[in-house]
């Protein structure tokens, strides 16, 4: 048996409060350790501000910021998969490479979605 004991799980609002701080720690870790996360967040903030200026109504604004949030979420998942794979060992393994590559591909698809939505929207504004 190890010296480390898992504390009993909190319930109710205390659990939600603890979860909020775990999430804050995760965001802080991603911001400090992952340059790709910082780049995605800065681009997302820029696009959210731009969408607030360009969108004609709430629905249009929501559709413009959707790919921004999606890419931030996918980058968090991508980074967590990379951290978990790196934690399991330092040796190269083909399955570890596949896991990292698939997580990266998910982010690529999110960024393509972002580009398609914004590209189509800005093109329509330009051609008006």
Curated annotation (Swiss-Prot):
It is an enzyme of class 2 (transferase). The chain crosses the membrane at residues 35-55, 58-78, 107-127. GO terms for biological process: phosphatidic acid biosynthetic process. The keyword Calcium does not apply. It catalyses: a 1,2-diacyl-sn-glycerol + ATP = a 1,2-diacyl-sn-glycero-3-phosphate + ADP + H(+). It is found in: Cell inner membrane. One of its GO terms (cellular component) is plasma membrane. A divalent metal cation binds at residues 34, 82. Keywords: ATP-binding, Cell inner membrane, Cell membrane, Kinase, Lipid biosynthesis, Lipid metabolism, Magnesium, Membrane, Metal-binding, Nucleotide-binding, Phospholipid biosynthesis, Phospholipid metabolism, Transferase, Transmembrane, Transmembrane helix. The keyword GTP-binding does not apply. GO terms for molecular function: ATP binding; ATP-dependent diacylglycerol kinase activity; lipid kinase activity; metal ion binding. The active site is at residue 75. Pfam families: DAGK_prokar. It is a multi-pass membrane protein. Catalyzes the ATP-dependent phosphorylation of sn-l,2-diacylglycerol (DAG) to phosphatidic acid. Involved in the recycling of diacylglycerol produced as a by-product during membrane-derived oligosaccharide (MDO) biosynthesis. This is Diacylglycerol kinase. It comes from Helicobacter pylori (strain ATCC 700392 / 26695). The gene is dgkA.
